[in-house]
């Protein structure tokens, strides 16, 4: 779990992951990069993260991936991230590409639905909670 202030340096993060795993006899490193879109008058997105719950969520994913001899990685921004820059990079490393391709999709979708990260639009330098694009965390009472 890598948390950064502001935009992510995608090339640096993915190169670090590649260098870490290239000699581990893995056949696949699949990545997903989320880029902030320019829409609805936003100049940026802003993120708050509750790291203790996020770590538990990631630990559960690591256990799941381990059962398939795979490993999940991710980096996310906190604070403001301007349009056309990245706030999220996820990766799956596996000896088998089919496992990595399946897990990256499941990981990204579960992240969107369950990770304790709150998103705000930044419009005219004002931070506005993006409730319509956010998901309630089941049983947490958040976003009720």
What kind of region is each of these model predictions?
Residues 1-86, 93-95, 99-105, 109-144:
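N-terminal, polar/charged subdomain of small-to-medium soluble alpha/beta proteins
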């Amino acid at each position: 779990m890598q948390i950064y202030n502001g935009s992510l340096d995608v090339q640096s993060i993915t190169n670090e992951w590649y260098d870490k795993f290239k000699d581990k006899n893995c056949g696949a490193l699949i990545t997903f990069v989320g880029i902030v879109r320019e829409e609805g008058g936003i100049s940026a997105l802003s993120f708050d993260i509750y790291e203790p719950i996020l770590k538990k969520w990631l630990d559960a994913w690591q256990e799941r991936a381990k059962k398939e001899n795979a490993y999940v990685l991710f980096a996310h921004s906190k604070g403001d991230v301007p349009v056309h820059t990245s706030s999220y990079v996820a990766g799956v490393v596996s000896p088998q590409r089919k496992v990595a391709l399946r897990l990256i999709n499941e990981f990204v979708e579960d992240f969107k639905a369950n990770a304790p990260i709150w998103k705000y639009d930044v419009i005219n330098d004002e931070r506005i909670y993006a409730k319509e694009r956010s998901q309630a965390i089941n049983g947490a009472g958040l976003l009720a």
